[in-house]
Amino acid sequence: MRIATFQLRSRLADVEGNIRKADALVGKLDRMLQGNGKGKNLDLLVLPEMAFSGYNFPSLKAVRPYLEPSEAGPSARWARTVAQKLGSVVAVGYPEICPSTLQDNLSLHAKTGEDVQDERRFNSLIVVKESGETLVNYRKHHLYYTDDPWAHEGESHESGFFSMPLSTPSKQQSIPKDDSGDANVGCSPKNEIPTTVGICMDINPYKFIASYSACEFATHARTSGAKLVVLSMAWLTLLSSKELSTMTDKPDMDTFQYWISRFAPLFLPDEGGVEDSSGEVAEPQVIIVFANRAGEEEGQEGKDTARYAGSSCVVGIRRCPRKVGDDDDGNRVEILIWDMLGATEEGICLVDTDSTPRMVGSVKI
């Protein structure tokens, strides 16, 4: 697969300016695709959480002018235009507003006893395919402190699961199944990949009160059979402005290691215990796209400045199970890193997951 992320240094409440930044990166990406000798095809482009509005809004009043109608605002229009231009799937995070239903109102009133409004608001990710048709409009399920004051919870992690079409054949694409549910090895692979999407805080414990080891989102990714996990993010860093000033081309590795740790369920071997091997190098079982933003956003209404971790990357999880006859009593997991941007860099992470990764780390389990 050929995957790109745009790591933007978005300015809060500057939709037009942020779109201009993204447009400039589209032009750069188009030139990169034409100049790499592999043709223009791109499978997926991912932008950060609330890419064009910015993220660090202190209240509903502050974010309200930037709420976009479901699948119909500037973010959705941009996604459709760029998807058609690049011939790829495009995912963009945006603040969504939509009318509430009677069922919504009754449910909310039953839970809270409060008067209900005639609108619902979500921190959302729209994913569109080359034709401009919406593949999924996912709504963030685990809200963070910043979006909790204005956004409603999305339905579930499962609502972000779908089959993503691919522009080019890939080693990770789907194998059609027969009536029993087993892979039909006599059929050609479908030009699509089982995919699940999430937004930033989704990989953390629910409200930071669920068990740390529950790893709800990663568990969903595993049980759903997803081969591609896409995360649109506005992930903060603990680094100071002074520390970040030296990290234009250096990723925030503490943040990266934490991200990887939240996918521990994907490290576990498949059911069945000891596996034999043909000796060939295995393909990664899951590919994860971390599409974060960079830069700082000053707070409004007394809210603290938000500093973002950048470090967008595309990685693979490759389980290397113990083979028959091995003396080692453990299994090993390899973390394949095709590319990673710096913590403060504004730019493009473009990778081909069928190529050799730039870095490989390992974890013993």
Which residue ranges define each predicted feature?
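Alpha-helix termini
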Residues: 30-40, 105-106, 112-113, 166-190, ...
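Residue-level recognition of beta-strand->loop/alpha-helix junctions
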Residues: 7-9, 48, 56, 139, ...
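N-terminal glycine-/serine-/threonine-rich phosphate-binding loop
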Residues: 1-44, 64
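Active-site beta-strand/loop signature of hydrolases that rely on acidic residues for catalysis
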Residues: 29-65, 83, 90-91, 202, ...
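Active-site catalytic loop in hydrolytic enzyme cores
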Residues: 68-71, 81, 97-228, 232-233, ...
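CN hydrolase (nitrilase-like) catalytic-core segments centered on the catalytic cysteine
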Residues: 73-91, 204-342
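Eukaryotic scaffold repeat domains enriched in small/polar residues
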Residues: 15, 89, 110-114, 296
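C-terminal helix/juxtamembrane-tail motif
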Residues: 355-365
